[in-house]
């Protein structure tokens, strides 16, 4: 079984309606003024703003403006994740997968990746695709679902998903490809992702 590697990739995705302090904090972060970012973001995170929680978690994860602290990073990302922040859900999934600051738990990783993927998060979709392709974390091997997920991530410009899809197609029948394409077309963000296909089980 090929080892699945998951890169922690963060996209802030801040909403235009975010309060001024959050926008100022994000701007300061992007300008690498981490002290100002911390000042603006921390009160909002403590007040329960999911975007601020995610950004503060990122600062702890990267050690920007604060000492690097993976437990704090997990804590803040978890607060955002349970509020439905897809970026944070992906991070929580990755931390469970790697056992970073928490006991390694691949089943929990799958749950959090799926939550993010069902919101259209391309990194989470790609991570799930690899799990379906390589039968990781107790996932059934299903090349059709893997291809579908790569399709969805590729539509958002995920380069690794594009490469993975090109590799997958070499293992698939035309019937499997057709099913995967149809599933991709019919799925809408915010709806459950399929957990199995008619033709995609097994494979090399």
Where are the language model's segments positioned?
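Positively charged n-region of N-terminal signal peptides that target proteins for export
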Residues: 1-4
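Bacterial N-terminal signal peptides
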Residues: 7-15
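Sec/Tat signal peptide C-region and signal peptidase I cleavage site
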Residues: 16-20
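Hydrophobic face of amphipathic alpha-helices that form TPR/SEL1-like repeat modules
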Residues: 21-28, 43-44, 55-62, 91-98, ...
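Short helix-capping/linker turns of helical repeat alpha-solenoids
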Residues: 29-33, 46-53, 62-64, 69, ...
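Terminal, low-structured helical/coil segments at or just beyond the last alpha-helical repeat
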Residues: 159-204
């Amino acid at each position: 079984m090929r080892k699945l590697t998951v890169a922690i990739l963060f996209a802030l995705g801040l909403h235009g309606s975010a309060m001024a302090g959050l926008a100022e904090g994000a701007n300061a972060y992007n300008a690498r003024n981490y002290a100002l970012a911390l000042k603006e973001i921390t009160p909002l995170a403590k007040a329960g703003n999911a975007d601020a929680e995610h950004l503060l978690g990122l600062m702890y994860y990267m050690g920007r403006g604060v000492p690097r602290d993976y437990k704090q990073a997990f804590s803040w990302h978890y607060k955002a994740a349970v509020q439905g922040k897809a970026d944070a859900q992906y991070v929580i999934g990755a931390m469970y997968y790697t056992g970073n600051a928490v006991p390694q738990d691949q089943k929990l990783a799958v749950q959090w990746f799926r939550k993010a993927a069902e919101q259209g998060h391309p990194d989470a979709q790609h991570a799930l695709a690899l799990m379906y392709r390589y039968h990781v974390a107790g996932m059934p091997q299903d090349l059709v679902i893997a291809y579908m997920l790569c399709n969805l991530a590729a539509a958002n410009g995920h380069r690794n998903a594009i490469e993975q899809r090109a590799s997958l197609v070499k293992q698939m029948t035309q019937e499997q490809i057709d099913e995967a394409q149809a599933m991709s077309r019919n799925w809408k963000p915010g709806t459950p992702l399929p957990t199995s296909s008619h033709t995609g089980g097994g494979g090399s």
